[in-house]
Amino acid sequence: MKTEESNKRLFAIASMIDDHFDSSAPILNSTYGFLKNIQKVALGLDQEDDGPQKVNSLYGDCITISCDASILKNPGGPSAVGFVIDFAKKDQANLSTARFCKASTNNQAEYDAIFFSLSTLIDLCGGANITVPINVISDSLLIIDQLNGVKKCNDENLRHKRDLILELSGSLPASVIFSWKPRNSTPELKQANDMAQNLLGVKNH
């Protein structure tokens, strides 16, 4: 698949997601038919002359997700998340998007960023089709430590969000790694942060 064609498909997917979901609807509640349409666009199956392709053709040896969250008032909200999915393939463009979330604290929003990014990847590729490692990067050391079992999660709301993510990642045949990196330390993390802030009307300098 040529780079130009790949970019067009990913933009089409992002547009489909934006049109289909409102700000509060969990991506995992999307309909089967809608997901099949997303897969067709992603794989080029919407064009008759392309022929069948495997989902694995979308990505390389590892998928990297960089995600971040932003909240105008902590606690209180409103809040938004942004994430960038890098398929580690030269001719495959990154998928980036942002959305509002219902989180009322920064830590809740950071968990939501990870959950929605993983959900989007699974909805796009189909969980059973993802066979390469997934590296999820966040700039929240607390959240990463809680997901990795390094620190306890005493807050009931955060514990529920953590368990949902662990259940989601545990359902995949591929391994999921939760990694910490400092704020804006990579172009992808900065992009994720900028997208979330832009959605909230925060100007980036």
Listing of model-derived features with the role each one plays in the protein:
Residues 2-18:
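Short amphipathic alpha-helical heptad-repeat segments
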Residues 106-114, 158:
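Phosphate/oxyanion-binding active-site loops and adjacent basic polyanion-contact surfaces
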Residues 112-135, 168:
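Short, basic/hydrophobic alpha-helical segments
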Residues 31-51:
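Flexible loop/turn and low-complexity linker elements, especially glycine-anchored beta turns
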Residues 61-62, 128-133, 174:
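Short coil/turn segments at beta-strand junctions that form active-site/ligand-binding loops
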Residues 9, 74-77, 133-205:
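C-terminal functional segments of enzyme domains
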Residues 18-29:
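Charged, low-complexity interaction regions
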Residues 51-109, 119-123, 202:
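RNase H-like nuclease fold core
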